[in-house]
Amino acid sequence: MKWRSTTVVCVRKNDSVVMVSDGQVTYGNTIMKGNAKKVRKMGEGNVLAGFAGSVADAMALFDRFEAKYREWGGNLLKSAVELAKDWRTDRVLRRLEALLLVADKKYTFIISGTGEVIQPEDDIASIGSGSPYAIAAGRALLKHTNLSAKEIALESIRIASEICIYTNDNFTIEEL
């Protein structure tokens, strides 16, 4: 059986950075849990981080990312690149199945196990199975409304939760 994914969304607008995730954990065709916390603050509250994929793998990556963040003196870009390099080259890390979404006041990055560190070209990023729906909704809301970052993030993931069967409407919100 396969663990199915989730949806995590990050929206930047004005001086606000908001990350929201759903709470559903799905194994095969069964919902195992509906209130998992998939986003958190790290780096003394200066960084938001969320994950999609295997929970145990993501926790290991959270810990590694936080160590890299401390090692590089709070430089999010360098921390993301160094984690991606380790993730790609280390035999044990290479087997971890998760994606990380990290953001601070300046940057947002998606970090993958294949070595990618992707900075979105606009002010919204998303990972997980509901990501395409959340991105589409978020881009439209950013472009055509005056909603806040928090309102856009929540509406984007709410729309994704109505379409993606691996995403529920039990949201966790973190803000910078």
From Swiss-Prot:
Keyword Metal-binding applies: yes
User: Per the record, what is one GO cellular component?
Assistant: HslUV protease complex
GO BP of this protein: proteolysis involved in protein catabolic process
Main localisation, per the record?
A: cytoplasm
Q: What is its EC number?
A: 3.4.25.2
The record lists the catalysed reaction(s) as: ATP-dependent cleavage of peptide bonds with broad specificity
Q: Report the superkingdom from the record.
A: Bacteria
Question: Which residues are Na(+)-binding?
Answer: S161, C164, T167
Record Gene3D superfamilies: Glutamine Phosphoribosylpyrophosphate, subunit 1, domain 1 (3.60.20.10)
Q: Which GO terms describe its molecular function?
A: metal ion binding; threonine-type endopeptidase activity
Active-site residues from the entry: T6
Q: Summarize the activity regulation.
A: Allosterically activated by HslU binding.
What keywords tag this UniProt record?
Allosteric enzyme, Cytoplasm, Hydrolase, Metal-binding, Protease, Sodium, Threonine protease
Q: Where in the cell is it found?
A: Cytoplasm
Q: What InterPro entries does the entry give?
A: ATP-dep_Prtase_HsIV_su (IPR022281), Ntn_hydrolases_N (IPR029055), Proteasome_sua/b (IPR001353), Proteasome_suB-type (IPR023333)
- What is this protein's function per UniProt? Protease subunit of a proteasome-like degradation complex believed to be a general protein degrading machinery.
**Subunit details for this protein?**
A double ring-shaped homohexamer of HslV is capped on each side by a ring-shaped HslU homohexamer. The assembly of the HslU/HslV complex is dependent on binding of ATP.
State the family named in the UniProt similarity comment for this chain: Belongs to the peptidase T1B family. HslV subfamily.
Q: What is this protein called?
A: ATP-dependent protease subunit HslV
Species assigned in the record: Thermosipho melanesiensis (strain DSM 12029 / CIP 104789 / BI429)
